[in-house]
Structures are given as C-alpha cells and as structure tokens.
C-alpha cells in the first residue's frame, strides 16, 4: 500500500514538474538570451566556446532544406495573405514591389555566396567578406531609391517598396553570416537562422496586415522583424560558432569585388531576364496581372528550389572533388545525375498542376485560375529549364570560370527584352508568359553548350 501511494506521489510530482516546465520554444529562447547576455558582458562575441559540432550531414540537409523552403515560400505565402485580406489589386502592388526587391537584392548579394563557401582555404578573410557585403548593401539601397525616384512612385506604393527593399537588404546582409557558417561546415545553423528570420517576417506581416489592412505598414513591420533577428541571432550565432578569422586587408575586398563581378553581372542579368516580362506588364496591364503572373511563376520557382535543395549543401564537396583531377569523371556523373533529378521534379510538378494545381491556386488566392491553366503548364516547363540553368551556373562558378557565361546572359537579356516588349504589347498577358518561356529556352541551350565547351577545353 505504501509502495502504491509512493508511486502515485511520484507520478503527481512528475506531472507537476511538466506543468511548471515552460514550452520548448521558451526554454530555447531563454538559453539563447543567457548566452547572448553573457557574451556581451564578457566583452567579445568571437571568444565564446562553440557548442555545436561541424560535419553534421543529416542536420545540414534537414535544416538547410527547411530554411531554403521557408525562404522560397515566403513570397508566395505573403502574396496569398495579401490577396485574401486586401484583394487582387493590393496583392498585385505588393507582388510587383517584392519582385523589384528580389531584383535589386542581387546587387546586395553580388554573387558572393558560392565563391565564399567554396573558398575552403580561406584565401580571403571573413572580415573582408563582411565589409564587402556592407558596401554592396549600401549600393543596393541606393539603387532602390534611384529606381523609385525614376518611376515616380508615391504614397502607398512607395512605402510598400520601402518596406520590401529594406527586408531584402537585411536578408542580403544576413547571407554573408550564413555563408560563413556553411564555409565552416555548419550549414544547418545557417538554415536555422534563415528559418527564424522568415518565420518572424511572415508572422509580423500577417498580423500587421490583419490589424491595419495596410500593405505598407505590414511591409515595414516585416523589415523591422528581420532586422531584429539579424542583430540578436544571426550575427552572434556566427561569431559564437565559427573560428576567429584573421584581420582583413583592403586588397582582399578589392579581390572579392573583382572575382565576383562576373557572377554578379550574370546573376543580375538572369534576374533581369526573369523580370523583364513583369516590367513590360507594368503600365500596360492592371496590377492584378502582376499577381496572376507571379502566382504561376511560383510553380517554376518551386522546381528551382527543389533542385537547389539537392545540390547546394554539396557545393563545398563539389569544389573539393573538382580540385582532384582524378575525380573529374565522377564530377561529370554528378552533373548528369542532378540534371536528371531536375527533369523528374519538373515532370512531377507538371502532373500535380494538371490534376489539382489550378484548383489549389484558386482556393489559396481566392480568385479563379482556371483561365490560366495553359499558362501554368508553360511556366512549369520553363521552371525545369530554369533549375538546370541555375545549377549549371553554380557549377561554372565552382570551376572559377564564371566570366565565360556573362556574354551568354547579355545575349539572353537582349532576347528577353525584345520578346517581352513585342509580345506583351501585341497579345497582353499571354505574351509575358511566352516571352519568359522562350527566354529561358534560349538561355538554357546557350549555357549547356558553354558548359560542354569548358569541360572539353579544361
């Protein structure tokens, strides 16, 4: 009897302890806050003892996949929220501003991430990468201001652009710290940082829009949330969990700008190629069509994201494989394998869109997308080509031959400009979709030929 009573008391004690124990999220936040405050009082973030091990392949894939997925799903999810709460016109304005923010983000990123993480011997210091990124983010802000001034934006649209541009600027700055974590083989921590920033942005935007019905205030709140996550989590985490880097030199900053300029130019041109049809629609078609185009574009973007989840965690290892001449055939097999994966994902996405995709989009956005079924199919095919284009360019960067692709992107940009202006003017929204598809097809063919030539000559 005493034993039974003792067991009952022990069970009750455990239950009471569990009730008193705060939720896991609260415990993690408290632990992080204690660690952060302790580091601040000690006078140095970089001298703290790392608590997390490197070389965690499974964690790298899981956290990077979640982080990349949340980051990629951020735009479509926020567009869904805006469409449901403020209608297609307001959502179209937000969608257009976010597209332009994504475009000028390439100025802030400057094509450095792949170069940074494949710098396995740390030829350039982390301090140099940080300073270079601050400079490009300042340039990004200047480009955004200049664009809004030239377009004559005012009122609600101007503030929407301000909020989205600010958010993407913070996102660009955070990328250099997450790149440092990946370079130190702690990619999963970079993924965790990305998840936190995006989740806070989604929550803040949604709550602010629900409370105020103001897209501009929601965008500004989103930017503030991202800034807090950068200052209170991403930057301290990077200093805590990576080795102290040597001091920076001015020559290193110059070298990063020079070496990554071809990558920046190519990626910026690629983003321009994707954006030109949307530029052509602005002023010609109502803002609603920006929403429709970007919604079916998300299908293409999803394919690129899915393929990126396969190969991006392995960029450092691919660089090491390429550095050994005896492993070049293995390198080629990896290229073929990932291209095959892209084809399979494209086929799966096409089948999904043909069965439930249109109905799902109509439900999520609160508007009928049946009239855009054919355009959705065409955009899915373009997405498969886009995924391979992105992959091949990353590989060319790993091979340090990125300058060879710049001419190709310039040609493709010219093709996209001519097609977009001509087709949108003559046949409207359908013309924007056809222009995007044909531009991606031209770029795909030219880039495949370029890669074959590099391998043949190298």
Show where each model-derived region lies.
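N-terminal membrane topogenesis motif
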Residues: 1-73, 117, 121, 127, ...
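Signature of the first transmembrane helix
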Residues: 23-43, 52-110, 141, 202, ...
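Membrane-water interface segments that mark the loop-to-transmembrane alpha-helix transition
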Residues: 28, 55-72, 97, 102-148, ...
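Interhelical loop/hinge segments that connect adjacent transmembrane helices in multipass membrane
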Residues: 38-57, 188-193, 215-222, 231-274, ...
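Transmembrane helical elements of multi-pass membrane transporters/channels
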Residues: 60-79, 196-201, 217-237, 249-316, ...
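Helix-loop junctions and terminal segments of transmembrane helices
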Residues: 75, 105-124, 183, 300-326, ...
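Interfacial segments at transmembrane-helix termini and the short loops linking adjacent helices
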Residues: 86-92, 148-164, 287, 354-384, ...
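Hydrophobic alpha-helical transmembrane segments
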Residues: 157-165, 191-241, 259, 297, ...
């Amino acid at each position: 009897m005493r034993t039974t009573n003792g067991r009952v008391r022990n069970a009750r004690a455990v239950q009471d302890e569990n009730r008193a124990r705060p939720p896991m999220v609260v415990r993690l936040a408290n632990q992080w806050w204690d660690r952060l405050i302790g580091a601040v009082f000690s006078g140095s973030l970089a001298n703290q003892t790392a608590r997390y091990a490197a070389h965690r392949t499974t964690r790298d894939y899981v956290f990077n996949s979640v982080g990349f997925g949340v980051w990629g799903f951020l735009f479509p999810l926020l567009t869904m929220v805006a469409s449901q709460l403020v209608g297609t016109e307001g959502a179209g304005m937000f969608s257009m501003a976010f597209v332009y923010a994504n475009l000028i983000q390439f100025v802030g990123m400057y094509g450095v991430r792949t170069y940074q993480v494949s710098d396995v011997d740390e030829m350039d210091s982390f301090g140099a990468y940080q300073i270079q990124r601050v400079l490009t983010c300042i340039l990004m802000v200047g480009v955004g201001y200049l664009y809004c001034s030239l377009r004559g934006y005012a009122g609600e649209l101007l503030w929407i652009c301000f909020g989205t541009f600010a958010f993407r600027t913070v996102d660009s700055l955070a990328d250099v710290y997450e790149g440092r974590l990946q370079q130190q083989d702690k990619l999963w921590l970079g993924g965790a940082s990305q998840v936190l920033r995006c989740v806070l942005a989604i929550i803040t935007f949604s709550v602010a829009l629900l409370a105020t019905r103001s897209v501009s205030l929601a965008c500004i709140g989103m930017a503030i949330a991202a800034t807090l996550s950068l200052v209170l989590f991403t930057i301290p985490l990077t200093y805590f969990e990576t080795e102290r880097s040597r001091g920076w030199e001015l020559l290193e900053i110059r070298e990063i700008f020079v070496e990554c300029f071809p990558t920046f130019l190519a990626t910026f041109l690629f983003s321009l190629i994707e954006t030109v049809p949307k530029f052509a629609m602005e002023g010609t078609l109502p803002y609603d069509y920006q929403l429709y185009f970007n919604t079916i574009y998300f299908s293409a973007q999803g394919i690129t994201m899915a393929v990126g989840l396969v190969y991006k965690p392995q960029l450092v290892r691919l660089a090491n494989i390429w550095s050994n001449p005896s492993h070049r055939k293995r390198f080629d097999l990896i290229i073929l394998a990932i291209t095959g994966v892209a084809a399979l994902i494209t086929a799966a996405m096409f089948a999904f869109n043909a069965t439930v995709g249109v109905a799902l989009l109509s439900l999520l956005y609160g508007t009928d997308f049946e009239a855009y079924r054919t355009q959705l199919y065409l955009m899915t095919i373009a997405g498969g080509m886009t995924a391979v284009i992105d992959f091949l360019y990353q590989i060319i960067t790993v091979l340090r031959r990125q300058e060879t692709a710049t001419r190709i992107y310039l040609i493709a940009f010219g093709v996209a400009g001519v097609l977009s202006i001509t087709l949108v003017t003559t046949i409207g929204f359908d013309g924007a979709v056809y222009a995007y598809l044909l531009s991606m097809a031209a770029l795909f063919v030219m880039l495949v030929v370029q890669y074959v030539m590099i391998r043949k000559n190298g």
